[in-house]
Amino acid sequence: MKGLLQRVRGARVEVAGEIVGAIDQGLLVLVAVEPEDTREQADKLLHKLLNYRVFSDEQGKMNLSLKDVGGGLLLVSQFTLAADTRSGMRPSFSTAAPPALGAELFDYLLQQAQGQHADVASGRFGADMQVHLVNDGPVTFLLQI
């Protein structure tokens, strides 16, 4: 399971012109599910997302987590993040989970996040989404669980 987290000042996801998820300051996370992923990996990713110290303290050091700052968490499914890009001129998606497994684990991750954090939003699994964000930093990390 991969999570590409971006520290944002604000972000929103639209589907067919309708805003389906939005946050103010916090983390936008693009989530890719791979074929061998499990709920245990989703739990580990969520723990890391909520506790990873990517926000600055009073001294300007990245020492505060999403929980510490009370920021929003916007989860967006993105199977292309799991692509194999090592050869050729076209990405291969054989390393991405089948849609049913991807949807199951993304929904599980979202439900767990909503139970553990106050401000959680999401895109719509499998939809053609437009993601709008204001990067803060920019600060971007690829988490692989």
Curated annotation (Swiss-Prot):
One of its GO terms (biological process) is D-amino acid catabolic process. A Gly-cisPro motif from one monomer fits into the active site of the other monomer to allow specific chiral rejection of L-amino acids. Keywords: Cytoplasm, Hydrolase, RNA-binding, tRNA-binding. It catalyses: glycyl-tRNA(Ala) + H2O = tRNA(Ala) + glycine + H(+); a D-aminoacyl-tRNA + H2O = a tRNA + a D-alpha-amino acid + H(+). Belongs to the DTD family. One of its GO terms (cellular component) is cytoplasm. An aminoacyl-tRNA editing enzyme that deacylates mischarged D-aminoacyl-tRNAs. Also deacylates mischarged glycyl-tRNA(Ala), protecting cells against glycine mischarging by AlaRS. Acts via tRNA-based rather than protein-based catalysis; rejects L-amino acids rather than detecting D-amino acids in the active site. By recycling D-aminoacyl-tRNA to D-amino acids and free tRNA molecules, this enzyme counteracts the toxicity associated with the formation of D-aminoacyl-tRNA entities in vivo and helps enforce protein L-homochirality. Signal peptide: none annotated. CDD domains: Dtyr_deacylase. HAMAP family: Deacylase_Dtd (MF_00518). Homodimer. It is an enzyme of class 3 (hydrolase). This is D-aminoacyl-tRNA deacylase. It holds the Pfam family Tyr_Deacylase.
